[in-house]
Amino acid sequence: MKVEIINKEQVEQLMPIWGETACICYDTPTKFKNGVAKTVLSTGHFSGSRGQYIYFKIEDVPRSLADQMARHSVGTAVNMQSFRYVKMEDFTYYTPSLIEKYPEAKAIYEDTMEVIKHNYNEIVGILNEKGIKGEKANQSARGILPMNTNTKLIMAFTLEALMNFMEKRLCVRAEEHIRKLAKLMRDEVITIIPELEDKLVPACEAKLFCPEGKMACGKYPTKDQLKEILNNHKK
């Protein structure tokens, strides 16, 4: 799994541009733009940041993870490797940690992947012999590729969308591999914008309660539990 921000120079200017944009709202001199940026970040006034995107190049992740990424559709843009235009003749794949843990399961898993790889190439080869080549052959054979076939994508986030993504995907209830990806993305961002370290956090840390209800891990009270705590405090 690899993660890289590909527009680092623009990301370095995200806070100053956001601050300058917000200055117009308050008729504040632009020399104070850095301070204004920190203020609107803390108060959640994101309108001035919505025209700026952070572009992540993400490689060696399973297609199942890429599909989960694409569910974050507000404030994002995604370009994903096409299994139609790209021949996946020697695809690599993701192995879940629980399968890695048990040799018997891992052996079956790896054997299955090799069978699929062989059969994919056999199908493409047969179609090629019939004069069907390129994307027509690839798109006909791609249906047998497993969900854990590794792929790559470039995904852009506004800051607001990225914070929402982190709230969902840094949660311990998120799948292991997308939580790992979220951590890598977070590390990349805060290297450039340290002010975001306490903003790119799971929902419980952002809200001070857990929105997962009965599925809560117990680190923070649920919303109902927090209400009860506050009501008891008022008595």
Please tell me what each predicted stretch does.
Residues 1-235:
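Family-specific signature for flavin-dependent thymidylate synthase
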